[in-house]
Amino acid sequence: IGDALKEPAQSLAESAAKLNAPEGKQLANQADVLVRLVDEIQLANMLADDSWKSETELFSVQDLIDEVVPSVLPAIKRKGLQLLINNHLKAHDMRRGDRDALRRILLLLMQYAVTSTQLGKITLEVDQDESSEDRLTFRILDTGEGVSIHEMDNLHFPFINQTQNDRYGKADPLAFWLSDQLARKLGGHLNIKTRDGLGTRYSVHIKMLAADPEVEEEEERLLDDVCVMVDVTSAEIRNIVTRQL
């Protein structure tokens, strides 16, 4: 059923995108939302009936982040928000796991964070747990108004309550449930902490096997024995630049 609905929805989105009038752009955006919703409902059904299958591959976490960011950057820019990426993993860190599942999780939560944030910034942090090199934590922090208790219920029962919205649309009611279910398929879970008026922290804990040492690429030591003076006002950005150097 999902495929049968997705095809006409995609056709509608493609046709609407060809219209030059302002109404055509609005129609195209609504059609894109419909396509995404059909795809997410199909995924939700597969997760619910346990027919979803994980696909393991070797991939770079940083490359995955570089793929996700362009998908959310236009929405971040049009709202005048800042985006910070703070990846504490090694530059060429390689992992074995379901790349597409992790991509979906990050995209869903970052899109939700953008919708619920009117001023400030969105931060994505990546850490390797001290207890095990195979366990990773992805944190998405926003400076929005916070997620309500009613919205939090969607983590366990999708569509049970309304989500907040901005001038561009509503936050995805399936985002929390799908992210948590996919994280559990990856050996972890989603944790959400929020403070009214201060923002929300989404913590995704997953298991991603580290690549064998012989598989990892040798880091280029281009800056060995080079002294660099960093003059950056923002402490967060200064720490990121210093660590990368």
How would you name each of these model-derived features?
Residues 57-59, 77, 82-93, 129, ...:
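Conserved catalytic submotifs in the C-terminal HATPase_c
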Residues 11, 41-56, 121:
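Helix-loop junction within the histidine kinase core
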Residues 66-78, 115:
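Short alpha-helical segment within the cytosolic histidine kinase core of two-component systems
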Residues 86, 149-150, 157, 164, ...:
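Disordered, acidic interdomain junction associated with two-component signaling
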Residues 186-193:
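Glycine-rich ATP-binding loops of the HATPase_c
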Residues 179-183:
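Detector for a conserved hydrophobic position within an alpha-helical segment of the HATPase_c
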Residues 49-59, 63-64, 94-96:
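Short flexible loop/turn segments at helix-to-beta-strand junctions
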Residues 121-133:
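Short beta-strand/loop element within the Bergerat-fold HATPase_c
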